[in-house]
Amino acid sequence: NVLENINDNLAIFTSRPDRNLKMLLGIWENLIIPKNKDLKLLVTNNSYDYNYKSIIKRKLSDQRNLIKDLQSSRMAIIPGHRAELYCLAAEEAKELCVPIVTLGIGSLAERVEHEKSGLIAKNDLQFSEYIFELFNNNDLWKSIRNNLVLQRGKNTWKKVAEELINQTDNY
């Protein structure tokens, strides 16, 4: 069930480490940890060197564990990357009804609707503020979560492929 067993202090990053994980770790270290050491960030296994109890490396395993990790997270934090054409991590989070906080880089501006499926920040400071907002504002979190529940299952591969083709036709 997508509505149970959520850790209210846990966020997750499931994209590839080269998709601005280093940027996210810097924001977490400088803007999140100093304000609340109880918050946890579950990240894709990577080679970056950091020593914070609040940043946890996910072991890459099977789909069931990824789904479990996503479902137990209050939000997905996905900055985005200029090379992304689609961002499967965002779609996975949305289908599992996990609100997203993003900088809207690359395709994330298209994958996330502000205050509908997540929050789109304009800069690093606003990004960190939106992370805190989703951790602390239950009404906003529930509103986005409920919208995601209503949208769940409405994206088919056919619809997504047609949208992608339409976007590429504009280039």
What are these regions (language model features)?
Residues 84-87, 94, 104-105:
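Short glycine/acidic-rich beta->alpha loop that forms part of the nucleotide-sugar donor binding site
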Residues 98, 102-109, 123-124:
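Short glycine-rich donor-binding/catalytic loop of glycosyltransferases
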Residues 2-59:
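Conserved catalytic-core segment of nucleotide-activated headgroup transferases in glycan assembly
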Residues 122, 138-170:
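A charged, aromatic-enriched C-terminal amphipathic alpha-helix characteristic of glycosyltransferases
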Residues 71-85, 98:
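Acidic donor-binding loop of glycosyltransferase active sites
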Residues 114-125, 133-138:
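Conserved acidic donor-binding segment of nucleotide-sugar-dependent glycosyltransferases
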Residues 62, 68-73:
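Short alpha-helical donor nucleotide-sugar binding micro-motif in glycosyltransferases
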Residues 67, 90-95, 109-110:
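Short alpha-helical segment that forms part of, or immediately flanks, the ligand-binding pocket
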